[in-house]
Curated annotation (Swiss-Prot):
GO cellular component, one term: cytoplasm
Protein's cellular compartments: Cytoplasm
Protein name (database record): Axoneme-associated protein mst101(3)
Region called 12 X 16 AA tandem repeats of [KRA]-K-[KEM]-[CKA]-[AEKD]-[EA]-[ALE]-[AMK]-[FKAML]-[KQA]-[EQKA]-[KQCEM]-[ECLA]-[AEQ]-[AEQ]-[EQAKV], residue ranges: 64-264
């Protein structure tokens, strides 16, 4: 009823224009054209049934459009959600990958640090071993040098001792030679004196027999005295020689004992160093 009044008041082209505004589909004859598949072109009718059909179809078309838009929005929302979830998963995967790479780098750095520390310790151990070997070699060289110096010192001491002994022996020999020379000179002098006395006695015997006899007695007494003195001197010289020989023997014994003590001390020192 209301629709018939509405159609009777407004011209057909106005109503069609109004419907076209709602549906957005109008042909050149001002006929409504639905955008849905089930809507067909139809001429505008003044009848109530046709108006209701049009209204119903328009409402259905609007509902379908609204449903399509809602479905589209839901689809877009689902797509957005799906994309967001995919992006989130990609982001999480990237974060995991980043964390894994960081952990790998940290592990590699720790391994490198550990290897470097191990290499450093090995290097320090090698240097310590090298230093210990060098110190041992230096100690051995010092001990060898010390032994060589001790041996050289002992050799020098022995040479000096031999030289000193040779000098003493030469001095003793010289003294003995001088003493023998003095004894020989004394004996020669005695012989000369005896010859002179004999000659004088013979000459005096020619002059005075009594004087010769008396002088002979005096000469014999003097000769006895001189012989006693010479004998005494010879005994003193022999005693002196004996004392010098005893002193030399004692000196040689002391030198041998000193050498023996030095060898014993050297052997004891060598035994201590070996232990």
């Amino acid at each position: 009823m209301l629709l018939s009044r509405f159609t009777s008041v407004f011209p057909r082209n106005v109503i069609v224009r109004g419907v076209s505004t709602l549906t957005s589909h109008v042909d050149r004859n001002y006929l409504v054209r639905s955008s849905f598949d089930k809507c067909q072109r139809f001429p505008f009718s003044d009848s109530k049934q046709e108006a209701e059909d049009v209204k119903k179809k328009c409402e259905e078309a609007a509902a379908k459009k609204k449903c399509a838009e809602a479905a589209k929005k839901e689809k877009e929302a689902a797509e957005k959600k799906k994309c967001a979830e995919a992006a989130k998963k990609e982001k999480e995967a990237a974060e995991k990958k980043k964390c894994a790479e960081a952990a790998k780098k940290e592990q590699e750095a720790a391994q490198k640090k550990k290897c470097a520390e191990l290499a450093k310790k090995e290097k320090e151990a090698a240097e310590k071993k090298k230093c210990a070997e060098a110190a041992k070699k230096e100690k051995e060289a010092a001990e060898r040098k010390k032994c060589e110096e001790a041996a050289f010192k002992q050799k020098c001491e022995e040479a000096a001792k031999k030289k000193k002994e040779a000098k003493k022996a030469a001095e003793l020999q010289q003294k003995c030679a001088a003493l023998a020379k003095k004894e020989k000179e004394a004996e020669m002098m005695k012989k000369c004196e005896e010859a002179a006395k004999k000659k004088a006695a013979e000459e005096a015997a020619k002059k005075k027999a009594e004087e010769v006899a008396a002088k002979k007695k005096a000469d014999e007494a003097a000769a006895k005295k001189k012989c006693a003195e010479a004998k005494k001197k010879a005994e003193e010289a022999a005693l002196k020689k004996m004392c010098e020989e005893a002193a030399l023997k004692k000196m040689c014994e002391e030198a041998a004992l000193q050498k023996k003590c030095a060898e014993a001390a050297k052997n004891a020192k060598k035994t201590d160093s070996e232990t």
